Amino acid sequence: MARKSLIQREKKKQRLERKYNLLRQSLKKEMSEVSSLDDKLDIYRKLQSLPRNSAPTRLRRRCLKTGRPRANYRDFELSGYIIREMAHACLLAGVTKSSW
């Protein structure tokens, strides 16, 4: 189980990313349309003035149940270990243990 402070920090990053997403996209689009170097530098400074944690690359997918940051399945938003436990407890329909 991840520490609660790490989970809250990740939620804060998600809120910041949603808040500044449209502004960041519009600035990037504006930068691609502008040809003068001075204008590009001005736009670049505006991008840099945005909060660091509002960048989408700073986000990390975490398991919804445990908060584990690794081995997550994107479709389920759960870690592999939790999916395995749920399959063994017959909570996932159609999942059987493989053998060969």
Swiss-Prot record:
List, alphabetically, the HAMAP family matched. Ribosomal_uS14_1 (MF_00537)
- Describe the family membership recorded for this protein in Swiss-Prot or TrEMBL: Belongs to the universal ribosomal protein uS14 family.
Give the function comment from the record: Binds 16S rRNA, required for the assembly of 30S particles.
One of this protein's GO BP terms? translation
Which proteins does it associate with, and in what oligomeric form? Part of the 30S ribosomal subunit.
Q: What GO MF annotations does this protein's record show?
A: rRNA binding; structural constituent of ribosome
Tell me the protein's name: Small ribosomal subunit protein uS14c
Query: NCBIfam families, from UniProt?
Result: PRK08881.1 (NF006477)
- Per the record, the gene is rps14
Do you know which InterPro entries this protein is assigned to?
Ribosomal_uS14, Ribosomal_uS14_bac/plastid, Ribosomal_uS14_CS
Highest rank taxon of the organism = Eukaryota
